[in-house]
Amino acid sequence: MRILITNDDGINAPGLEVLEQIALELAGPEGEVWTVAPAFEQSGVSHAISYTHPMMIAKLGPRRYAAEGSPADCVLAALYDVLQGARPDLVLSGVNRGNNSAENVLYSGTVGGALEAALQGLPAIALSQFLGPETEGLADPFECARTHGARIVRLLLERGLWDGEDYRLFYNVNFPPVPAANLRGHRVAAQGFRRDTSFGVEPHMSPSGRRFLWIRGGAQQSPTLPGTDAAVNLEGFVSITPLRADLTAHDRLAELEALIG
């Protein structure tokens, strides 16, 4: 098996090392693991692509590259340059430092990397490690993802749904904020929504008198509706959410047509 991995936390992020370990276990001794990851932090860039300026790319070692671009850029760089046409069997993005549940899905560069792979017709999975009070004292905050990641990916490869639609199905996996031994299992869960925890701004003044703003997110420990992704994560379960890039509100098409068609 040939596996391509990327992330949004950058080439030196600890979560990427976790994903490399997961990918090597899945690929086996006869397989290949290729890493093409951002040279710098790209958290929050979603599915951005850098088509207005050139993307520098550097080979760091065997099958290991850093690109000065987003996770989606890295997937494109891998498919159309680094791999020289040898398409991967699977694309993994992560393991993100922090959850990509609920509304975070829309901002996540980790999800954006998997989304681009899906648009390119490839099986893709985004993986993230929810952090919280129970992970703060761990020597390895990624312990849950490191221990259970390969098993969850293998489960999806062997028993998950995969299709060839134009907006191809891909998966968003979040590991709960618990030690590996405390994992309660996994749940298929819809994307949730944390009320009153959306992004906002925090104003400041520089020593020179210039006003500046920090973008700040809301409380990540707020649960979503029962059975949705963040809710099951906070209950100690891995959440597995099938996604598509198609943002059409299909449940409203007929109603809107009746009103204005």
From Swiss-Prot:
Family to which the UniProt record says this protein belongs: Belongs to the SurE nucleotidase family.
Principal localisation: cytoplasm
Record text on cofactor binding: Binds 1 divalent metal cation per subunit.
Entry binding sites for a divalent metal cation: D8, D9, S43, N96
GO cellular component terms, semicolon-separated: cytoplasm
Stated name of the protein: 5'-nucleotidase SurE
UniProt xrefs under InterPro entries: SurE, SurE-like_Pase/nucleotidase, SurE-like_sf
Localization terms from the record: Cytoplasm
